[in-house]
Each structure stands twice: as structure tokens, then as C-alpha cells.
Amino acid sequence: MKKIISIFAAALIMCSTSAGCYSEKEAVSTDGSTSMEKVIGVLGETFENDTGITVTYNPTGSGSGIKAVAAGTCDIGLSSRDLKDEEKEQGLTATILAYDGIAIIVNPENPINDLDVETIAKIYTGEIANWSEIGGVNAEIVLIGREAGSGTRDGFESITDTEDNCKYRQELTSTGDVITTVAGNPAAIGYASVASVKDSVKMVTVGGITPSEETIKDGSYVVQRPFVLVTKADTELSESAQEFFDYITSEKAREAISSAGVVAAN
């Protein structure tokens, strides 16, 4: 019995001093882009399986995630847009994790299969208001988009040159809500992360180009944006957060990132 107890005690001592035991390491908190849910979920799960360190994710949207980093309420912010000058002036740093296409989605019943960027812009600014104007059915186009502060919205409006001019019927707070709404309305059109699109909606080609890893990587699919990790330049990450950051920005994470449907930056 004494021998068993001493072995158990020795094991506890070894565990407390070994890098292989992670019970005392704090969790890593991430906050931000709802479009990055899938890739952060995959990376967080892989990292936790390898290290035992938990990664939490708060899907608040890009703008809120950036604010959370600035306020010191999370370790790593997640943004599906580049940092603005005023955000950089707050001492925030952007590291590109991956590139993601923004899919233009319609209801599966919609006969439209391809739109060019100019036509998409005319639709969202109200210049084209009925599907029949571009070869579809006689139905008013229902414009679905994201809320102000969304990285996906920022990227979409920047690429289509429609900032502050979109005539949204609904401005929704998550990628999932956009997909669900378009799936439920035959006259709707929306935009969402390619990595998040489900079979309940149809992705149209843009200028004849289908969004894919290859077309996003070579730039031929033009409706794309970066997935960005946001940190504070003058604030050191915790040991756990630094370990997670180093892993997800390394070549080791490339396969996991690719499995989430986005293109790794490294």
C-alpha cells in the first residue's frame, strides 16, 4: 500500500511540473467574427486535443471582437475585415490567418445562377429591384445583409463599392441568420462566408467563377476578404494564448484551416 501511495504521489508531482499536464493553464478566449466560427472551432478543437487547453469563442461580430481586444476582455479578437486606421491607432495589430470567399447566395428555387459584380451592386443599391429584370421570375428582390460593424458586410460593400448605399430589407447579426432567411424566401438574396454556406441555399457564380479554395487562392474569385487575428501590440499574451496563436499561424495548422473551407495565409 505504501508503495502504491508513493507512486501515486510521485505521479502527481511529475504532473504538476510536466509540460504534458495542462490543468493549471488558463483557457484562451476569442471574440468576434461569426464567419470565423467554423475555422476557429476546428483549430480550437485540434489545439485542445493536443494540449488540453480550452479555447472559448464568443460570436459577437468583427467590430465587437476588435473592441473586446482593445478593452482587454478577450485574448484574441477575430475579424473578417482589415483593421481601420483608427483601430490601429489604438495599438491593435492584425495578423492574417486565412482568406475566405464571400458567397452570393439565393434561394434554391431561384433560376439565377450567375451575377457579375456590377449587377450585384445594382441589386443592392436598388437600381435593379425585380428578378425579372435580369432573367428571373417576376418578384421583388428581397435584400438580406449583415448589421453595421460586420466584417462580412464591410468586405462585401467595399468590393461592390456600395458602402452606405445598400437598400437592405433586413440587417441580421450573424452568418447563420442570413443563410436561414435566404433559405426561407424564394425572392431573397444575401451574402455569407463560403465556409459557412449550407445546402439550404444556392451559391451563384460571380462573373462565371465559382468560389473555391483554388479560385480564392489565385484571386479569380474577387468577392473575398481576410480572416484576421487581432491583438494588442503593447500587451503580452498569456502563455496559453501565445501557444494557441503560435500554433494557428504555423504551417502545422494549414490542414485544419483548409478543412474548414478557407485558404491558409501561411
List PLM regions with ranges.
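Sec-dependent N-terminal signal peptides of Gram-positive bacterial secreted proteins and lipoproteins
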Residues: 2-23
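Exported/periplasmic ABC-transporter solute-binding proteins
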Residues: 4, 22-266
